[in-house]
Amino acid sequence: MSIEAVWGTLQDGLNLLYRREHMSKKYYMMLYDAVYNICTTTTLANSNNNSPEFASEFLYKQLENYIRTYVIAIRDRISACSGDELLGKCTIEWDNFKFSTRICNCIFQYLNRNFVSKKVEDKNGEIVEIYKLALDIWKAEFFDNFKVKTIDAILELILLERCGSTINSTHISSVVECLTELDIYKVSFEPQFLDATKLFYKQEVLNSKETVIEYMITVENRLFQEEYRSRRYLGPSTNDLLIDSCESILISDRLKFLHSEFERLLEARKDEHLTRMYSLCRRVTHGLEDLRVYLEKRILKEGHETLQRLAKDSGLKTTPKEYITKLLEVHEIYFNLINKAFDRNALFMQSLDKASKDFIEANAVTMLAPEKHRSTRSADYLARYCDQLLKKNSKVQDETALDKALTVLKYISEKDVFQLYYQNWFSERIINNSSASDDAEEKFITNLTATEGLEYTRNLVKMVEDAKISKDLTTEFKDIKTEKSIDFNVILQTTGAWPSLDQIKIILPRELSTILKEFDTFYNASHNGRRLNWAYSQCRGEVNSKAFEKKYVFIVTASQLCTLYLFNEQDSFTIEQISKAIEMTAKSTSAIVGSLNPVIDPVLVVDKGNEKDGYPPDAVVSLNTKYANKKVRVDLTTAIKKATADRETDAVQNTVESDRKYEIKACIVRIMKTRKSLTHTLLINEIISQLKSRFTPNVQMIKICIEILIEQLYIRRSENEHNVYEYLA
């Protein structure tokens, strides 16, 4: 059989294939074998050339001519079509052509593997794989003739869809697939599509008369539509470019317009629209920056206005609870807003932190304090608030209140001040047995450790340990003490861990001094080498009174107890006699007598003088036999607490200053030991950087500490540069 005859058989098969008529597997294999025979059998060659290569080349050329003729016929058949009709015809013809060509490629696979692959290896650019050959012919003979009309038709359909019409997107996706297969999608279609998109949305923005909220809803819908459109029938490379183009025109170019509504939405608490604005603006570069700035200003403004109202309403009577509650209210509003509407954005959280720190550290309430206490007022109030929460009979029902208190601490620079105030109040709760729950105390200290570190809570942890040990020791001692009528509890305080208060010396009643001596003996028996010092200034007690018409239980300090105990012997004493009896100074005696001689319900009465100016030595102090009080348990320590409150505040300030100097000096030595040599400016900056988590170091104090260390020969000024410090080993 001649090669022409074999080609005739193949041509019949191709006609069947491209007409999409049924082809049996047997017929398919017969065509495959025919291709194989042409490419391998020399007897099929004509008389002029009987090589397989000649036959393969003949077959390749014949197939190329066949496909070209077929494509030209299709082109001529639909040349008059346009618009959606053209797209429909193109879709049908392309789908048929693509399917038939893939089968054709399989039939001629042997030609691909041998003849074509060798030509490709030899870099013969005219010979390509059969499927690629068919695509090249389709592009050259068909698509190049309809390219403009086809792309215009696609863009027209997309425009109709954008304007609300329903279209047959199958035609678009099929043509887009064709463009992609022909490798001309990005060159021929994508740029025109993006240009048309930009033109459409620029015109839409120009014609828009919507409010900001209406516009945001429109943009949301438009972006959703474009993303959906891209997924439905556009190439994968287009999505990002398409969305970028839309975002640029609809959002970036309209940021000022969008941002203009932000403050009003904040004031009105329109979370839904704030979320919408945030979601849109976060899509573009610098879209959130102005919002962040607006938010920070708004938080700052609301924080200060809230505290101004509180200062105006309550003034100096502002309670720690009122103050901390207001701080938390403002913070919680915007913390929840950022969580809900702004997806917990880190930059927005930073703005919340910055604004909160600003209005918490200095505000209208702190300005009511004496100037020297203004910077520490927030720390003071926070410590008092925590004390209220942890005391028995706390009126605060919120179980998370203590956790929220730590939120305020986060924004207080003077954390060392809070530490000292909290330590003082914690000490009082332990001494007075006024804690609501030991578990709550320990949990708060654990949380405080987690946020501020082990060193920060070292003394508090030691105080807890001391309190536990004290309970065990008290229980053991009660079993052996001889005086059973007096209930006695002891609290051991490790030196340095507990607040340092004024130490006083007084003469205790015999019954009490006997118990103390017994405890000394008991303690020393099992703790050899340790010495106990009784801190009378921190002692508290309860005494039963039968001197009045009604029985009372008085809660008193040690000094008050000793003073009242004298009246078991007689009804009146002079100030001088009381002072000698309990071995206290005249000034201290006047203060104690004054605490028992308040204006309302005095237990003792004095015939002349007053506490403020000091009672004269000969002033007679008598038991008020007419004393009456509605309460059975009466706390007589209240007056002393009020009198010592300011002194304790000043003491905390002095302790803070002393501790800070020590920390600054230690920090300087650490830095210089590591760095060996540093300029003055770099040293100052390094000190502030290392200590800012505990407090904000005062530059003047740093300079003083540097001079002290120079005098103590830890560092020196460089001989060559006066502004440089050197470490002395």
UniProtKB/Swiss-Prot annotation:
Give the matching Gene3D superfamilies: Cullin Repeats (1.20.1310.10), Cullin, Chain C, Domain 2 (3.30.230.130), Winged helix-like DNA-binding domain superfamily/Winged helix DNA-binding domain (1.10.10.10)
Q: Does the keyword Ubl conjugation apply?
A: yes
Query: What's an example GO cellular component term for this entry?
Result: SCF ubiquitin ligase complex
- Cite a single GO BP annotation: SCF-dependent proteasomal ubiquitin-dependent protein catabolic process
Q: Where is this cross-link: Glycyl lysine isopeptide (Lys-Gly) (interchain with G-Cter in NEDD8)?
A: 673
Q: Which GO terms describe its molecular function?
A: protein-macromolecule adaptor activity; ubiquitin protein ligase binding
- The Cullin neddylation domain sits at 659-720
Q: Which residues form a coiled coil?
A: none
Which keywords belong to this entry? Isopeptide bond, Ubl conjugation, Ubl conjugation pathway
Domain of life of the native organism = Eukaryota
Q: Which InterPro entries match?
A: Cullin, Cullin_CS, Cullin_homology, Cullin_homology_sf, Cullin_N, Cullin_neddylation_domain, Cullin_repeat-like_dom_sf, WH-like_DNA-bd_sf
Spell out the post-translational modification annotation for this entry: Neddylated; which enhances the ubiquitination activity of SCF-like complex.
Function (record text)? Probable core component of cullin-based SCF-like E3 ubiquitin-protein ligase complexes which mediate the ubiquitination and subsequent proteasomal degradation of target proteins.
Q: Which family does it belong to?
A: Belongs to the cullin family.
Q: How does it assemble?
A: Probably interacts with skr-3.
From the Swiss-Prot or TrEMBL record, give the protein name. Answer: Cullin-6
Q: Which organism is it from?
A: Caenorhabditis elegans
